[in-house]
């Protein structure tokens, strides 16, 4: 696709693997587009040259505090310019940034920080109290209010030798088993994936992309921040998605590209129509998942040229691509076709390739080094399970029809909720920590907003003399897990359906669904606190 970034009349050729370094790309863009805005927020903005200066300052500061190659820096921060600068500064030193989910608190937060083994944690003031509640973690904690101001640390930053396959980040994902796994991504993993987003959306210098996702979500980087960096475009960061304010943000910031996940775009679609819906600069979007029945009408109503889709995971982003190029006649619900730099195969449980139309686990091989992630951080058992027979096993069940691929299910019991993967095992473990709960089964039932998404339902069995109602259990879960773990539906039952080997038969619970005895958080006006 001609992967080159112009530096004057000299291209930084990204077809050359050694050029695929995030710090090198920033340096070139700072010279090519010094005055172009790179990151813009509601409070401030920063140009490419200013970002390079800020990254240099933070690199010196980190180096002076003992941060070196392969050290980890946890970031518990709101979306802001400093967040992006700290990641680039860490990578310039060969260090590794670890975004921490800002919804985490209590033991979830403690576990993430302990497992990440950071040398430093940088925290926004909004979250300092959560760290204080955890007690001593034997890690340096720095408030964003204490970051070095302009005029300090102006010496030249160190320039360690970097390699395009070096790990630059660890993204914690719930995985498919309920045990959190740290996905190690390299410079190349990010850049090749961001180039896919650039290619699909036709992004270029002068464009503005809007990021509505939290920065602990890999999609924020691969679809918005890094594509802007690769093209010299501008990325607008907002704190959160707002269905009511989205189109005004698009108009105010001149947004030409964006990404929405889960039910976000369905909320936009279901909002009452108004005159001038199509009067906006948005040209290209990535909306996942977008029902085929809505795609065309959505484009017409809002005046959008193209709605692309991609299928992947933190381990291998943009694995399948579905480009809305006006030429390809995509079958309904097709996930797309494989990216050029990977080989894929659908295998059964014995490792044998399945035939057309038969569900098999999606497995991946890279055609060049460092296309896939670098493995799971300090997790040999997860790596052994994921990499077998020369293939990376994704855990996704797909079927193939000709050259097109279609999603079937997850091999493990995972709940898809508003663009997130919620482990049923993890939710059950939280519920079972309540002294009144003896058994718990969490599962997803089809969402009314989007068929590909779930509403979370939890069925529990209580101690014989326990006095616990559903709302109290919901509050307990809210206090001990991320807010999005709080089920919409809770039902207290006398017993759970079990197999002869005492395994819970969740398919029977799904088939049973919501009953007259089910507590509905939405109907009761219960709202989880973030």
What residue spans do the PLM features occupy?
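Conserved AMP-binding/adenylate-forming core of the ANL superfamily
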Residues: 18, 27, 35-80, 84-88, ...
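Conserved AMP-binding A3 loop
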Residues: 47-49, 168-192
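AMP-binding/adenylate-forming catalytic core of the ANL superfamily
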Residues: 104, 121, 312, 364-369, ...
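Conserved pre-ATP/AMP-binding loop-to-beta segment of ANL
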Residues: 154-172, 179, 202-208
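Conserved AMP-binding/adenylation subdomain of ANL enzymes
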Residues: 191-208, 216-257, 271, 339
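Gly/Ser/Thr-rich phosphate-binding loop
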Residues: 230, 255-260, 269-329, 343, ...
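Conserved ATP/PPi-binding loop(s) of AMP-dependent carboxylate-activating enzymes
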Residues: 341, 352-385, 422, 517
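AMP-binding/adenylate-forming catalytic domain of the ANL superfamily
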Residues: 481-503, 524-530
């Amino acid at each position: 696709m001609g992967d080159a970034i112009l530096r004057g009349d000299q291209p930084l050729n990204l077809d050359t693997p050694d050029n695929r370094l995030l710090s090198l790309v920033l340096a070139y863009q700072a010279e090519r587009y010094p005055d172009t805005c790179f990151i813009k927020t509601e409070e401030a903005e920063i140009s490419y040259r200013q970002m390079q200066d800020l990254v240099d300052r933070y690199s010196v500061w980190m180096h002076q505090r003992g941060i070196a190659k392969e050290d980890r820096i946890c970031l518990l921060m709101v979306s802001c310019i400093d967040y992006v600068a700290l990641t680039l500064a860490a990578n310039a030193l060969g260090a590794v940034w670890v975004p921490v989910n800002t919804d985490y608190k209590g033991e979830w937060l403690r576990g993430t920080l302990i497992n990440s083994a950071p040398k430093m944690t940088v925290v926004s003031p909004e979250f300092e109290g959560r760290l204080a509640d955890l007690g001593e973690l034997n890690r340096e904690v720095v408030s964003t209010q204490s970051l070095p101001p302009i005029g300090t640390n102006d010496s030249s930053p160190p320039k360690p030798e970097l390699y395009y396959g070096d790990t630059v980040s660890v993204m914690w994902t719930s995985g498919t088993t309920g045990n959190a796994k740290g996905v190690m991504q390299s410079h190349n993993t990010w850049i090749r994936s961001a180039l896919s987003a650039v290619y699909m959306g036709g992004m270029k210098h002068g464009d503005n992309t809007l990021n509505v996702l939290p920065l602990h979500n890999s999609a924020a980087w691969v679809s918005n921040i890094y594509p802007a960096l690769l093209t010299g475009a501008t990325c607008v960061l907002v704190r959160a998605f707002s269905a009511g304010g989205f189109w005004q943000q698009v108009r105010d910031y001149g947004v030409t590209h964006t990404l929405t996940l889960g039910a976000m775009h369905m909320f936009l679609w279901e909002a009452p129509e108004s005159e001038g819906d199509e009067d906006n600069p948005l040209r290209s979007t990535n909306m996942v998942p977008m029902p085929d029945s809505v795609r065309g009408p959505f484009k017409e109503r809002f005046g959008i040229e193209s709605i692309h889709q991609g299928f992947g995971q933190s381990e291998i982003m943009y694995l399948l691509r579905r480009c809305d190029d006006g030429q390809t006649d995509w079958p309904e619900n097709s996930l797309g076709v494989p990216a050029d730099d990977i080989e894929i195969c659908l295998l059964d449980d014995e490792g044998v390739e399945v035939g057309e139309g038969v569900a098999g686990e999606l497995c991946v091989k890279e055609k060049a080094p460092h296309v896939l992630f670098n493995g799971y951080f300090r997790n040999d058992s997860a790596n052994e399970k994921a990499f077998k027979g020369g293939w990376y096993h994704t855990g996704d069940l797909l079927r193939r029809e000709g050259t097109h691929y279609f999603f079937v299910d997850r091999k493990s019991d995972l709940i898809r909720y508003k663009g997130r993967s919620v482990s049923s095992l993890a939710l059950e473990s939280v519920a079972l920590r309540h002294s009144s709960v003896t058994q718990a089964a969490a599962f997803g039932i089809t969402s009314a907003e989007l068929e590909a998404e779930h509403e979370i339902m939890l069925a529990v069995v209580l101690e014989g003399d326990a006095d616990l109602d559903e709302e109290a259990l919901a509050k307990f879960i809210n206090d001990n897990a991320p807010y999005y773990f709080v089920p919409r539906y809770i039902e207290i039952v006398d017993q759970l359906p079990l197999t002869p080997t005492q395994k819970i038969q969740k398919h029977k619970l799904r088939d049973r669904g919501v009953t007259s005895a089910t507590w509905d958080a939405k109907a009761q006006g219960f709202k989880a606190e973030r």
